[in-house]
Amino acid sequence: GASMGGSTALKLAFEIPDSIDKIILLSPAGLFGEPKSIPFPLNQIGASFLGLPQVRKSLCRQAFAFPDECVGKMEEQIASIHLGCKGWRNSLASFAKSGGFAGTQKYIQNIPIKTLCGENDRILGKKEIKNIRNIEKLNFVGLQNCGHLPHIDLPSLSSKIIQDYFLE
């Protein structure tokens, strides 16, 4: 799972452990803390705010280690593709009202896990990366010159690590 998908992967592995042999996490978000519900109407306002073009552009740039070199119109379009989906705003508002992902480290079991994180991840931040690095069961790999998207910032290296992990 990538980013919040990492929390989803951990929860799924906890719920159906016999169906999962290994997990790969890419810059997993939501491992620490407690869920914090954002009540109506703040959840709706927040979802609308996150749909603003300047906010989308800023979030997209934060995801990359070197945004001046890596972020163009195509990356901004990809980061905003969900805005074209019917119901995206209400779905995001509902997710915010639910409390989102937090504290999912409690789902870490004895399933092998490898975790790739960019050392320049400005979404998770240095404190979160340090906390992730300190969870022994996560088999942490820190990637230099990489942001929140190892599979995009360093696709060849990330795919090699992932392939080697699943073939071992």
Q: Where are the predicted features?
A:
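Flexible "cap/lid" loop of the alpha/beta hydrolase fold
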Residues: 10-15, 22-50
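Gly/Ala-rich beta-loop-alpha elbow adjacent to hydrolase catalytic centers
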Residues: 1, 5, 9
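Residue-level signal for the nucleotide or nucleotide-sugar donor/cofactor binding architecture
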Residues: 83, 87, 124, 153
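Conserved alpha/beta-hydrolase catalytic His-Asp/Glu region
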Residues: 36, 52-109
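Generic structural signal for small/hydrophobic residues in well-ordered secondary structure
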Residues: 27, 79, 92, 115-118, ...
